[in-house]
């Protein structure tokens, strides 16, 4: 997410693209409850926000935002996303992906005027219905070069991504913009074109000038100006949109190799030409009509002979005539200027306006019916005169052609009469055809003008097409549009799946192959496949008597009940009738087929078309000529259903042309990288900011946004990098990732997710990311929020405690300081009046003044000497530095020179090798191109030879026709027709010669452009396209020739020509397969060469690795030597510390001497002499100390010299290594060797870097030690400045020098940081090189895979070719047979041969289709070969890039060596400065000896305080250890206690539930009432017999299941412990009451256990495995708990060792002790409360008796409920698991209770002692009470024994019932399996029957068709036979006449 500073570049558009950081943070911090915040289904709003109040039985009660409470089902509730996802820019990242989340995200962003939002691959845009400042030049500049995730969503971001992908990936791009009318498709298309026109010319100082007289503007202006012209003629007002595009368009913008604009072209689809003659009330026709009548240009009004009132013209005034939001006058000027900019001539401009005016006049033409006839005649000629004048036609001819058109019947033309309605229909069709053809011609002219003939490399296509349409009345237009969207959605699904598949494959995720593109295949095949809707429609158009009803019947017969996507619509009141329904992906659409046959045929008045072709207006004549039709087919203009016309004699329907253009569009899209934009209408009223939920949801479904989300949810939509996941979610379980050791982010993420309680099937681990299913990330976020809340609360508590303790510590220190001051003041007040003290006060200053003067003089002399020495040392150091710098510079220059020479030599060799390779490749390509050109020339020669043969055959046909001319009169007419068609053929052959000439020109162009490989590939693609077009034309011409020969009924020539055509196609296919085979062999040879080179590279890599190992050994030796030097330095440092210690001892002795002097006061002369001796000794010791320091300095100097020598040796060795590296670089031949060498060098550098870092750390430690010493010395000097004023300036100089040292240290640290950054940069580059290498290897592997695919395809082609040859030979044999039959009996069998000819023609057509399929496969193989060549070129470019990167790395390595030398130089400088500072410190340390008086008292006091502090610290540490152990134990006890209490509560709840359910079950068992009546009287015997029964059960369970042993043993032990405790406590009343309470509680527990065991014993065998697994799980959990406890123990030990303040920990422990004592008191109170429970004994007994009575009452009703016991027994199996868990809890409770019992035993002993003192009376009373209680216990035991006996009987009964239920269940399962098998068989039989019925229907249809054809053939044969008989009679009569005359 960008910051506010980064968003500033967007200017005023920033708030409309992304909200500020403050607003985002406020929105995300809103209160949110993930469990209660939901969306619920609402009847009005579709979905509303709500808060869950309760969930019961699959129903959810929620309170909506409006305050209403609703109850809905679970599946109507959708969870809400956390606030962090509010207004999210990419909806695919939401953790909960569903319809309401998408809807409300769009709504909230739209309310904030952020109209663009991503949804995975989609960019969704909502129409704002107002102007927003988000398209200005500032925004264009801000989006340029930005990645998608770096900027807010925008159409400019999509455009720039397409542009950048085109430049980087060298692949054509496309932007698919879809949506309903009024959604903003056209506006976004304009913005895309504006963006490309802006950025593609940025940087050009001079714009392109006009290259001819036609161009009136630059290419950018023309591209932008194409929109106003197309909008004027193609846009209109609709109900939803004032400027709705009524056609689809695909704009291709071509770019050159550098990314500059080269040219553009436009393809149009589905123009709504019906709007020319008809509009709804709320709509109007195309804008151009109203622009012309706006009277902005009066000369147009005069020229077109029209008025300014639209109501004068019927075609344009059926709806509204004005639009408030459009100024027609301004739009007219924009259209007129666009015509100028686009280079239309003045004649063309006038023609455009005149034809538009003629269309308006057509609507006013009137016709009437003749009297007593149905014939129409003109009702006035004024309007017709105007229309004819505007079109340069004769008015009378026009009217005659309309009323009396000439129709061709056979080979004759007849005049046909027209009714009035037929004339009006013809006029409307002509008006629509003129307008449509003019529009398509304008598109063709625009394309010609935008084609600048500049070299173009790639293109970006922008598709602006209508979205899915579901209206009340849906016709053929809606079917075409919906079918287009279906194909586009399939294309998107497949593309999205491929991207997801690549992502999963790249990340190594196991993913099942699901091609979502196949989801829509059923609907698409239903429409376009053979016998589909389009196929049936075209078939019906072939029959003259076909109607809409017959078309509907055929649809029903073919598809109703056989395809799930084809349905019969349900009749709806108030709606137009629908004939069939199709289930599209966006919904079910009802279609009305009225008029589909006429729409598909698209008939025109051929007589009027002939007039148009002869018009003197060139534009009109061109529109209706054959060239225009060809231009339509090439430009794609007509785009489908509107512009189809007949070409030659072929018959092409609107649907066929639409499918052809759609297939071209899909081919274009598949060859590009697509980008998807979906436009949304927010409301129907065009209100800004308002959003209608149902409308938006409908569009999201239709646009495929929700479909994309469905696909996304199938996989893993949420994905996070491992490092980000570890950083964000580590807080969930920090203990899962061990501290203090390195662990990979991926392993850490795996451990973290494995330790969290989530569904582990909902995520997968990739190579770099972790993938999550939808919804899991939201759960993790919720868990993280809860954890953070706990941590923050705990942190706040710790911080508050810490602050309180700090404040308390300050108070304690303040108190101690006050006590110290008070003590000293009192002592001073006591001694200040002593006489000796007064004398001391007077003498003490005098002694100090004399001493200070001497010391000052000595210090001055020493300072001067030190200054001189420092100056000399500085001078020497500077000289040495200058010399060293000069030497290092020379050394670096030499290294750089040698390195540059080696690099230049290596680069030259590599360039030479590369040029040789490219030359060889180019020569091979040129050779291939020339060979292909020669092959094409041979093919063309063969075609010309065939043409000659055809001409010869035509001459033979002429002779045959001359012979037949004597007998048949009609044959003469057919002959003339044949001659005309032959002339047409010769003209087409001339066109073929022109195409051959074009091919030769292209060959020359290819030979000239061989040096540029990319241009060569482009030319080859153009050549292939032209060849395929020529081939299509040739095939069409051959088809025309076949038609003419069919009319002449010459079957033999048809068959021979078809044979030759098949032979030619086969030869072409063979040659293409040979070319593919040659290419494959070349690729195999290249692969073998590459593999050989890779093996050589591998061997060289191994050699260099061995050399790298040797270098690493040398470096390790050098590192060992450096470590030895460091050890010597450490020894020197230790000796220096020893000397310092001696100095301190001497100073301490001096201080003791001075103390004695001060105590003596006025000493004798002997003492003074003694003091002088001591001073002399002190001076001698000082001199000795100085000599020792000098010796240490000398040794340090020698060590430094050794270190410098070792550094020099290292430098020499580095130079040697450099020379060796250069030699190795010369031997490098491929990129992989350089990368490996760099890797080895990087390892060496990293190790040397580590050594240098160690040295730097040691130096930093020394600097820090010196710094601390300097600071201490500076502090002492500052204290003496008050007494030494003259030395103040000198101390200032010292402090300044210390600041300089600090700055030097900071400089060193900064240098170190820069050094580390450079090394990290080198590592990053090395990783990039490794990634590039892996990418190359992957590309090589993919190319091998492609070669394998090509080989397989070639084998398939060979098999197909063999099949074709067999078919051809069979056809040839049949042709020979038919030829012999024809020659023997040609006249009699004419009709039969016609039938055979049709069959053969059908078979030939099938063979041709097969050959076309083979050619298509060959073309696909050629494309794959070209793609492989492109990939090879890409690999070569990648190799060049990696070579350049290696050179850059070499340069960086040299820079690194230079930086290393500078670092060493800085190190020596700092070392010298450190030595100087050490000298200064030694000089300052001599002064410390003179500062005795002020230092003595503080030193003594400090020593005493230290000793005391040390003792205290030792005591405190001992106490803290003890306290910590005690606290830990108390803490553990507290945790155990809490856990036990929690388990106790859970156990009690579970036991209560189990008791209630089991009591309910007891009432249902048969015959239990007899046994339970004795429970009251025999409860004493029940306890004893229960003991025996438990023992028996224990033995049984040991044999049956070992897992139940633990529970039974626990119960037996608890009971035995209770009995033992009861016997021990017989002597005391309190003890007996406690035991009685315990025994009663145990009796109740025994009763409950008896009921529990009743359920346990029922399904023991079934749950044996579950119990074992549960035991193993418990063991694993115990082991995990022990491990965690060990980890916690280790952490506690570490924390204890790292405590910084012992006082704080001691107080914490004291506080914890207090807390523990309070908890102990709480435990005592709980124990007392347990003792008080004895008073409730009598009440408990009465409650038990009442319960027994209830049980007896329930037993009386048991017979009625006994039948339900079988079903309820299954429920008890589920409770077994619960009881197993409770048994474990009971075990833990028992141990705790044993501890409490021991405590109580201790207290009872004390009470017993008290009781003995109480007296005999009290004892007697107690004994009596005990006996009473014992009697009661015995009675209870007896009753218990009786209950256990009854229990055994019931258990046997329960076992019998369980066995019976098990048998019944097995029988039911067997019956269910049998039923399922029978149902599956029935379904299979039904499916087979349906298939057989379908096949029979197909066969029946074929049979009927063949029977119909047979009947027609028989009729024709009868007619022919009768004619033959007549001719025979005539010939005989003629013969007889001749004989008679003779």
Curated annotation (Swiss-Prot):
Amino acids binding ATP: 179-186
Record's GO cellular component terms: A band; cytoplasmic ribonucleoprotein granule; intercalated disc; muscle myosin complex; myosin filament
Keyword Iron-sulfur (UniProt): no
Example of a GO MF term: actin filament binding
Domain Myosin motor: 86-785
UniProt KW keywords: Actin-binding, ATP-binding, Calmodulin-binding, Coiled coil, Cytoplasm, Hearing, Methylation, Motor protein, Muscle protein, Myosin, Nucleotide-binding, Phosphoprotein, Thick filament
Residue(s) carrying Phosphotyrosine: 389, 424, 1467, 1495
Positions bearing Phosphothreonine: 64, 69, 419, 1258, 1268, 1289, 1470, 1504, 1520, 1733, 1739
Region (Actin-binding): 662-684, 764-778
Tissue: Expressed in the cochlea (at protein level). Strongly expressed in spiral ganglion neurons with axonal sprouts and supporting cells around hair cells. In the organ of Corti, it is expressed in inner and outer hair cells, and in supporting cells.
Domain IQ: from-to ranges: 788-817
Effect of deleting the gene: Knockout mice exhibit impaired hearing and outer hair cell dysfunction. Reduced prestin (SLC26A5) activity in outer hair cells is a major pathological feature in knockout animals.
Modified residues (Phosphoserine): 36, 625, 1095, 1099, 1165, 1240, 1246, 1264, 1291, 1295, 1306, 1309, 1477, 1498, 1517, 1545, 1557, 1577, 1603, 1606, 1717, 1729, 1742
Location of the Myosin N-terminal SH3-like domain: 33-82
SUBUNIT field: Muscle myosin is a hexameric protein that consists of 2 heavy chain subunits (MHC), 2 alkali light chain subunits (MLC) and 2 regulatory light chain subunits (MLC-2). Interacts with SLC26A5.
Domain characteristics, as noted in the entry: The rodlike tail sequence is highly repetitive, showing cycles of a 28-residue repeat pattern composed of 4 heptapeptides, characteristic for alpha-helical coiled coils.
Name of this chain's protein: Myosin-1
Source lineage: Eukaryota, Metazoa, Chordata, Craniata, Vertebrata
Gene label: Myh1
């Amino acid at each position: 997410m960008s910051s506010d500073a980064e968003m500033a570049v967007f200017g005023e558009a920033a708030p409309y693209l992304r909200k500020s950081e403050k607003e985002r943070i406020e929105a995300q911090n809103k209160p949110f409850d993930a469990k209660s915040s939901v969306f619920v289904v609402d009847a009005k709003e579709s979905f509303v926000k709500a808060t869950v109040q309760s969930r019961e039985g699959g129903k959810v009660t929620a309170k909506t935002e409006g305050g209403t409470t609703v109850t809905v089902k679970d599946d109507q509730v959708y969870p809400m996303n956390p606030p962090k996802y509010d207004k999210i820019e990419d909806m695919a990242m939401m953790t909960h992906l569903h319809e309401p989340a998408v809807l409300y995200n769009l709504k909230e962003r739209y309310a904030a005027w952020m109209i663009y939002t991503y949804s995975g691959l989609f960019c969704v845009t909502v129409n704002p219905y107002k102007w927003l400042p988000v398209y200005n030049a500032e925004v264009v500049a801000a989006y340029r070069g930005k990645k998608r995730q770096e900027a807010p969503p925008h159409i400019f971001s999509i455009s720039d991504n397409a542009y950048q992908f085109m430049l980087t990936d060298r692949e054509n791009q496309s932007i698919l913009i879809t949506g309903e009318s009024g959604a903003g498709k056209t506006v976004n298309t304009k913005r895309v074109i504006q963006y490309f026109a802006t950025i593609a010319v940025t940087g050009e100082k001079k714009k392109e000038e006009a290259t001819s007289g036609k161009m009136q503007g630059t290419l950018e202006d023309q591209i932008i100006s194409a929109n106003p012209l197309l909008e004027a003629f193609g846009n209109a007002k609709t109900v939803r949109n004032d400027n709705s595009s009524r056609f689809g368009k695909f704009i291709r913008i071509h770019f050159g190799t550098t990314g500059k604009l080269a040219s553009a072209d436009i393809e149009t689809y589905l123009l709504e030409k019906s709007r020319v003659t008809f509009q709804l009330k709320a709509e109007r026709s195309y804008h151009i009509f109203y622009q012309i009548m706006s009277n902005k240009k009066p000369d147009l009004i005069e020229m077109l002979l029209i008025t300014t009132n639209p109501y004068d013209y019927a075609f344009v005034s059926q709806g509204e005539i004005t639009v408030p939001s459009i100024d027609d006058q301004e739009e007219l000027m924009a259209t007129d200027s666009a015509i100028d900019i686009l280079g239309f001539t003045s004649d063309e401009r006038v023609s455009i306006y005149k034809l538009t005016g003629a269309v308006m006049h057509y609507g006013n033409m009137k016709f009437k019916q003749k009297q007593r006839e149905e014939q129409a005649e003109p009702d006035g000629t004024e309007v017709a005169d105007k229309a004819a004048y505007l079109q340069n036609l004769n008015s009378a001819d026009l009217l005659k052609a309309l009323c009396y058109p000439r129709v061709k019947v056979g080979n004759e033309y007849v005049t046909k009469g027209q009714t009035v309605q037929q004339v009006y229909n013809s006029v409307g069709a002509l008006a629509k055809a003129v307008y449509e053809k003019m529009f398509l011609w304008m598109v063709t002219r625009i394309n010609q003008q935008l084609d600048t003939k500049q070299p173009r490399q790639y293109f970006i296509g922008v598709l602006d097409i209508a979205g899915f349409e579901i209206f009340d009345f849906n016709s053929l237009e809606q079917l075409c549009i919906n079918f287009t969207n279906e194909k586009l959605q399939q294309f998107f699904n497949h593309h999205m799946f491929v991207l997801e598949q690549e992502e999963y494959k790249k990340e190594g995720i196991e993913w099942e192959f699901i091609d979502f593109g196949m989801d829509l295949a059923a609907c698409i095949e239903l429409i376009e496949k053979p016998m589909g809707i389009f196929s049936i429609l075209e078939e019906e158009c072939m029959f003259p008597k076909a109607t809409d009803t017959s078309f509907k019947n055929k649809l029903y017969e073919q598809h109703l009940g056989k395809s799930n996507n084809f349905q019969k619509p349900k009749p709806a009141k108030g709606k137009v009738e629908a004939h069939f329904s199709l289930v599209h992906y966006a919904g079910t659409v009802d279609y009305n087929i009225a008029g589909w046959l006429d729409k598909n045929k698209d008939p025109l008045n051929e007589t009027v078309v002939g007039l148009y072709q002869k018009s003197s207006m060139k534009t009109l004549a061109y529109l209706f000529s054959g060239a225009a039709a060809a231009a339509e087919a090439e430009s794609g203009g007509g785009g489908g259903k509107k512009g189809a016309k007949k070409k030659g004699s072929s018959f092409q329907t609107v649907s066929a042309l639409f499918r052809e253009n759609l297939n071209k569009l899909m081919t274009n899209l598949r060859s590009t990288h697509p980008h998807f934009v979906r436009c949304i209408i927010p409301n129907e009223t065009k209100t800004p900011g308002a959003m209608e939920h149902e409308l938006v949801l409908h569009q999201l479904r239709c646009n495929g946004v929700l479909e994309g989300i469905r696909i996304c949810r199938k996989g893993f939509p949420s994905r996070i990098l491992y490092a980000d996941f570890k950083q964000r979610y580590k807080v969930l379980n920090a203990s899962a990732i061990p501290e203090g050791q390195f662990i990979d982010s991926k392993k850490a993420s795996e451990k973290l997710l494995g330790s969290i309680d989530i569904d582990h099937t909902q995520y997968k681990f990739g190579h770099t990311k972790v993938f999550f299913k939808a919804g899991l990330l939201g759960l993790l976020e919720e868990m993280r929020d809860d954890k953070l809340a706990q941590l923050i609360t705990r942190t706040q508590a710790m911080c508050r405690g810490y602050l309180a303790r700090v404040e308390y510590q300050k108070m304690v220190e303040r108190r101690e300081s006050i006590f110290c001051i008070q003590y000293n003041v009192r002592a001073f007040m006591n001694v200040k009046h002593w006489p000796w003290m007064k004398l001391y006060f007077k003498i003490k200053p005098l002694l100090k003044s004399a001493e200070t003067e001497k010391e000052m003089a000595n210090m001055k002399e020493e300072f001067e000497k030190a200054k001189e020495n420092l100056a000399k040392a500085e001078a020497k150091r500077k000289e040495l530095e200058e010399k060293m710098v000069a030497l290092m510079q020379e050394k670096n220059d030499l290294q750089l020179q040698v390195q540059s020479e080696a690099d230049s030599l290596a680069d030259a060799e590599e360039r030479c090798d590369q040029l040789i390779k490219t030359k060889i490749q180019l020569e091979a390509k040129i050779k291939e191109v020339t060979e292909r050109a020669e092959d094409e020339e041979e093919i063309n020669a063969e075609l010309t030879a065939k043409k000659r043969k055809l001409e010869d055959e035509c001459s033979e046909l002429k002779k045959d026709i001359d012979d037949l001319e004597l007998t048949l009169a009609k044959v003469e007419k057919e002959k003339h027709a044949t001659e005309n068609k032959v002339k047409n053929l010769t003209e087409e052959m001339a066109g073929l010669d022109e195409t051959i000439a074009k091919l030769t020109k292209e060959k020359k162009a290819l030979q000239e452009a061989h040096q540029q490989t990319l241009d060569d590939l482009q030319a080859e693609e153009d050549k292939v396209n032209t060849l395929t077009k020529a081939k299509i034309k040739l095939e069409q011409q051959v088809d025309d020739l076949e038609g003419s020969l069919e009319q002449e009924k010459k079957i033999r020539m048809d068959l021979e020509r078809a044979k030759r055509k098949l032979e030619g196609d086969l030869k072409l296919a063979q040659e293409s397969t040979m070319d593919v085979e040659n290419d494959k062999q070349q690729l195999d040879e290249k692969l073998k060469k590459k593999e050989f080179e890779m093996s050589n590279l591998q061997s060289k890599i191994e050699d260099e690795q061995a050399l790298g190992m040797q270098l690493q050994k040398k470096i390790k030796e050098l590192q060992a030597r450096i470590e030895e030097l460091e050890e010597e330095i450490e020894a020197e440092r230790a000796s220096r510390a020893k000397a310092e210690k001696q100095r301190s001892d001497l100073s301490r002795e001096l201080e003791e001497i001075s103390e004695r002097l001060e105590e003596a006061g006025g000493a004798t002369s002997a003492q003074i002499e003694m003091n002088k001796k001591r001073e002399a000794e002190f001076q001698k010791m000082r001199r000795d100390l100085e000599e020792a320091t000098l010796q240490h300095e000398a040794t340090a100097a020698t060590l430094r010299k050794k270190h410098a020598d070792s550094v020099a040796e290292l430098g020499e060795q580095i130079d040697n290594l450099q020379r060796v590296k250069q030699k190795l670089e010369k031997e490098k031949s491929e990129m992989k060797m350089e990368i490996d060498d760099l890797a080895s060098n990087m390892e060496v550098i990293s190790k040397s870097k580590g050594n240098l870092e160690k040295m730097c750390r040691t130096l930093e430690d020394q600097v820090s030690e010196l710094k601390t010493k300097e600071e201490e010395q500076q502090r002492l000097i500052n204290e003496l400045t008050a007494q030494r004023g003259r030395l103040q300036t000198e101390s200032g100089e010292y402090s300044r020098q210390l600041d300089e040292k600090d700055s030097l240290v900071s400089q060193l640290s900064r240098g170190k940081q820069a050094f580390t950054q450079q090394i990290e940069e080198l590592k990053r580059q090395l990783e990039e090189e490794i990634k590039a290498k892996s990418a190359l290897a992957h590309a090589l592997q993919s190319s091998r895979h492609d070669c394998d695919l090509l080989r397989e395809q070639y084998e398939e082609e060979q098999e197909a070719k063999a099949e074709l040859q067999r078919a051809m030979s069979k056809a040839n044999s049949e042709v020979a047979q038919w030829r012999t039959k024809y020659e023997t009996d040609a006249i009699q069998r004419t009709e039969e041969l016609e039938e055979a000819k049709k069959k053969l023609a059908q078979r030939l057509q099938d063979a041709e289709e097969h050959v076309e399929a083979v050619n298509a496969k060959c073309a696909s193989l050629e494309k794959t070969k070209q793609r492989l060549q492109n990939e090879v070129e890409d690999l070569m470019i990648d190799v060049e890039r990696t070579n350049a990167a290696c050179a850059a790395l070499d340069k960086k390595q040299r820079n690194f060596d230079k930086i290393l030398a500078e670092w060493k130089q800085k190190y020596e400088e700092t070392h010298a400065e450190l030595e100087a500072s050490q000298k200064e410190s030694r000089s300052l340390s001599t002064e410390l000896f003179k500062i005795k008086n002020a230092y003595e008292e503080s030193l003594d006091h400090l020593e005493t305080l230290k000793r005391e502090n040390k003792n205290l610290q030792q005591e405190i540490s001992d106490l803290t250890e003890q306290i910590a152990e005690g606290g830990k134990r108390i803490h553990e006890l507290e945790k155990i206690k809490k856990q036990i209490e929690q388990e106790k509560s859970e156990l009690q709840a579970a036991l209560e539930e189990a008791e209630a359910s089991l009591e309910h079950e007891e009432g249902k068992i048969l015959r239990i009432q007899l046994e339970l009546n004795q429970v009251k009287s025999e409860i004493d015997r029940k306890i004893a017999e229960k003991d025996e029964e438990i023992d028996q059960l224990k033995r049984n369970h040991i044999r049956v299941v070992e897992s139940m042993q633990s529970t039974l043993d626990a119960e037996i032990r608890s009971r035995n412990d209770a009995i033992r405790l009861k016997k021990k406590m017989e002597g005391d009343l309190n003890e007996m009451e406690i035991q009685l309470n315990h025994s009663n509680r145990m009796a109740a527990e025994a009763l409950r256990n008896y009921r529990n065991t009743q359920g346990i014993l029922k399904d023991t065998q079934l749950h044996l495995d579950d119990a074992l697994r549960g035991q193993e799980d418990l063991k694993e959990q115990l082991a995990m708990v022990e491990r965690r406890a060990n980890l916690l123990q280790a952490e506690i030990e570490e924390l204890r060792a790292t405590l910084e303040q012992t006082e704080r920990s001691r107080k914490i422990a004291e506080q914890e002790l207090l807390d523990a004592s309070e908890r102990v008191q709480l435990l005592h109170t709980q124990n007392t409360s347990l003792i008080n429970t004895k008073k409730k004994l009598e009440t408990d007994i009465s409650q038990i008796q009442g319960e027994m009575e209830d049980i007896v009452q329930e037993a009386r009703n048991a017979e009625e409920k006994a039948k339900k016991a079988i079903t309820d027994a299954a429920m008890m199996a589920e409770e077994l698991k619960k009881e197993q868990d409770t048994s474990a809890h009971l075990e833990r409770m028992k141990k705790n209770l044993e501890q409490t019992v021991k405590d109580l035993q201790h207290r009872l002993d004390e009470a017993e002692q008290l009781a003995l003192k109480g007296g005999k009376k009290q004892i007697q009373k107690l004994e009596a009470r005990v006996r009473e209680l014992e009697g009661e216990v015995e009675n209870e035991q007896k009753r218990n024994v009786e209950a256990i006996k009854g229990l055994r009987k019931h258990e046997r009964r329960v076992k019998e019932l369980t066995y019976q239920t098990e048998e019944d269940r097995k029988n039911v399962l067997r019956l269910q399996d049998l039923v399922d098998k029978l149902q599956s068989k029935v379904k299979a039989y039904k499916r087979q029957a349906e298939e057989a019925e379908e096949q029979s229907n197909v066969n029946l249809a074929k049979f009927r068709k063949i029977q119909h054809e047979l009947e027609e053939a028989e009729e024709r044969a009868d007619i022919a036979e009768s004619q033959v008989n007549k001719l025979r009679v005539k010939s005989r009569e003629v013969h007889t006449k001749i004989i008679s005359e003779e």
